[in-house]
Amino acid sequence: MSCSMKTEHLQSLSLLQWPLSYVAMFWIVQPLLICLLFTPLWPLPTVYFVWLLLDWKTPDKGGRRSDWVRNWNVWNHIRDYFPITILKTKDLSPSENYIMGVHPHGLLTFGAFCNFCTEATGFSKTFPGITPHLATLSWFFKIPIIRDYIMAKGLCSVSQASIDYLLSHGTGNLVGIVVGGVGEALQSVPNTTTLLLKKRKGFVRTALQHGAHLVPTFTFGETEVYDQVLFHEDSRMFKFQSLFRRIFGFYCCVFYGQGFHQDCKGLLPYHKPIITVVGEALPLPQVKNPSPEIVDKYHALYMDALYKLFEQHKVQYGCSNTQKLIFL
């Protein structure tokens, strides 16, 4: 086996461990903890569960990040698989707080994870003095073991309490919100740039309440790494996907990429570059109780800034000159 092939297989295995680690924690580690309660080792899980109760509100109070976890070498292999990079267009001042709109959601948000939940692309060196927090579904933090793992990588709850805490305790905090949410995952097909944004205004309201700056970002290539099977709204499969979302909070998407060999289908993503372009921060005044008109004003300014960011970089990063950013 050639050296390049070994490297490629190592990158593929590193990528697979990302979702499989959660599966192992949920289906192996958690049942093991429960089983240990009925053995002489019962004090170990008992101490953890007591500590879990005492630590329950930590995800809403800034989380508990670990620089050691964020610097694991495995994230570098995931970065190199695509590869994933981050592009800074303007500096971010550590004397301010920020809400960063992450677009698009994609299927597994590889770009946002690698850029903001690890140091694989050098976020801390690119934006010195800025602490990134990527917000995700709150119920993930109710799952033992998994909650601690994702907090270590810098993820936080997308709850209002969590975001309010981060934006009101010190400066230099950046909260990344995937504004399109799980609904945007169904828009994730190659050669499309469609965002669910027109009615998503809560992040603007929160930014105004705290006087936080808004930072538009666009990740080119995020929707190119998988093909997705889309179903008609009247089909049974679409109804199942909708039911699944109501129960679990996200869609059960049917998608495929490549296998360990690029000439076969599988669940590995395609080797395509993913580039997150971080735009210039949009300053907002602090308005404790912003009116709908003020929210609409800054929401429109944000959409305009995001559109210009896309137009400025689209050809350089794989989009055609005629491709447009569509807001739904």
UniProtKB/Swiss-Prot annotation:
The yes or no answer to whether the keyword Lipid biosynthesis is present is: yes
Transmembrane portions of the chain: 12-32, 34-53
* Topology in the lipid bilayer: Multi-pass membrane protein
| Compartments where found | Endoplasmic reticulum membrane
Predominantly, its location class is endoplasmic reticulum
Q: Which molecular-function annotations from GO does this UniProt entry contain?
A: long-chain-alcohol O-fatty-acyltransferase activity
Q: Which CDD domains match?
A: LPLAT_MGAT-like
Q: Which GO terms describe its biological process?
A: lipid metabolic process
- Reactions catalysed according to its record: a long chain fatty alcohol + a fatty acyl-CoA = a wax ester + CoA; 1,2-di-(9Z-octadecenoyl)-sn-glycerol + (9Z)-octadecenoyl-CoA = 1,2,3-tri-(9Z-octadecenoyl)-glycerol + CoA; hexadecan-1-ol + (9Z)-octadecenoyl-CoA = hexadecanyl (9Z)-octadecenoate + CoA; decan-1-ol + (9Z)-octadecenoyl-CoA = 1-O-decyl-(9Z)-octadecenoate + CoA
Keyword flag Membrane: yes
Q: Which GO terms describe its cellular component?
A: endoplasmic reticulum membrane
Q: Which UniProt keywords apply?
A: Acyltransferase, Endoplasmic reticulum, Lipid biosynthesis, Lipid metabolism, Membrane, Transferase, Transmembrane, Transmembrane helix
Q: List the EC numbers from the record.
A: 2.3.1.75
Which superkingdom is the protein from? Eukaryota
Biological role: Acyltransferase that catalyzes the formation of ester bonds between fatty alcohols and fatty acyl-CoAs to form wax monoesters. Shows a strong preference for decyl alcohol (C10), with less activity towards C16 and C18 alcohols. Shows a strong preference for saturated acyl-CoAs.
Report the family membership. Belongs to the diacylglycerol acyltransferase family.
What protein name applies here?
Acyl-CoA wax alcohol acyltransferase 1
User: What species is given as this protein's source?
Assistant: Mus musculus
